Amino acid sequence: MTINLTKFSLTILVALTLTACGSSGGSGDSQSAHTPSTSIHTQNNSTPNKNTSTPPVNVSNANNLEIKNNDKTGGAFIISGEDGHVTLKKVDITTNSDLNVLYIDGTKIPLSSPSIKSNGWLNIRSGTGKVSIDGIETSRDLKVCCGKYTDTRIGKVLSKNKNEDTYFFYNGNLTRNMPVGGTVNYNTGDSILSSYHDELGDTDEAVGTSQFSADFVNKKLTGSLSVNEKKLNINADISGNTFSGTTQSDAFKSQGIAEGKFYGENAKELGGLVKANDNSWSGAFAAKK
């Protein structure tokens, strides 16, 4: 569904209806007092769970963590340059006071609004001007996931001029009570990848799925991202409510690294970033039990 606006700094009031990816889609009513320039639509790229059973987890002896005000709640890649000459700078996100607002490198970016309901990906295009969401303006295009996650946000903020940066990001409400035993499967997940060497086929960006398994006894996280029939495997070590590791895939020329965090009660969700060692691709992912 699409909502159109023309004037700069307009407040978005929407009633959105999800469109299932790969199906004939659906339609809904929208409220707009203006003519086209800014568009918003949602899509659902999730696939049904293949296995929703989760082995029991020992949470009675959960490891309670102290969360401080200056703790790193997420992270972002600041992307600059053009295809073949891309540079990525990693920055930490240190606030999750509002998951609908992103604070990166001194910039405040609106991601969504309580009035916008989307279980899948939310796409906001600002056209040639600016869009205002809950009083916060941005001239960037946004791709944000997803309303299905109560404690996690991931996505991409796309610059349209040389004076602004493009970001991949993840952020959320850090887990305070980490499980200390058992294995948890995260079978419902989403991902977004950009490739600068045509490794995703006819597109340089695509959304897909993700799934993970966390072994809280041996402190290991394994999983994969699936985008455009390309699979990227992740192997990481768990430390507290964070994880870091490597990626491997026969579909990409360069292998890479992964990082992320657990979010919500008893680590019910996770989110993170991936990137190639040579910066030829990068992306973000999230998953939940």
Swiss-Prot record:
Biased composition (Polar residues): 33-43
Region (Disordered): 25-66
Biased amino acid composition, Low complexity: 44-59
Classification via NCBIfam families: slam_lipo
Protein name per its UniProtKB record: Uncharacterized protein HI_0973
Record organism: Haemophilus influenzae (strain ATCC 51907 / DSM 11121 / KW20 / Rd)
